[in-house]
Swiss-Prot record:
UniProt entry keywords in alphabetical sequence: Cell membrane, Membrane, Protein transport, Translocation, Transmembrane, Transmembrane helix, Transport
Gene this protein is translated from: secG
UniProt similarity note: Belongs to the SEC61-beta family.
Taxonomic placement: Archaea, Methanobacteriati, Thermoplasmatota, Thermoplasmata, Thermoplasmatales
Name listed for the protein in its UniProt record: Preprotein translocase subunit SecG
Membrane topology: Single-pass membrane protein
Record's subunit section: Component of the protein translocase complex. Heterotrimer consisting of alpha (SecY), beta (SecG) and gamma (SecE) subunits. Can form oligomers of the heterotrimer.
Length: 55
C-alpha cells in the first residue's frame, strides 16, 4: 500500500513539472535589477518634480 501511494504522487508531480516546463513566456524578459533601478529612478523624478513644480 505504501508503495502505491508513492508512485501516485510521483505521477501527479511529473505532470505538473511537464506543464510548467512547456509554459511560454509572452512578453519582454527584463532583468530584475533593471526593474528595481527603474522604480528608484521614477521615485527620484517624482520627488524632484514635487520640489520644483509650483503648487
Amino acid at each position: 500500500m505504501a508503495s502505491d501511494r508513492k508512485s501516485e504522487g510521483f505521477q501527479s508531480g511529473a505532470g505538473l513539472i511537464r506543464y510548467f516546463e512547456e509554459e511560454e513566456i509572452k512578453g519582454p524578459a527584463l532583468d530584475p535589477k533593471l526593474v528595481v533601478y527603474m522604480g528608484i529612478a521614477v521615485a527620484i523624478i517624482v520627488e524632484i518634480a514635487k520640489i520644483f513644480w509650483p503648487p
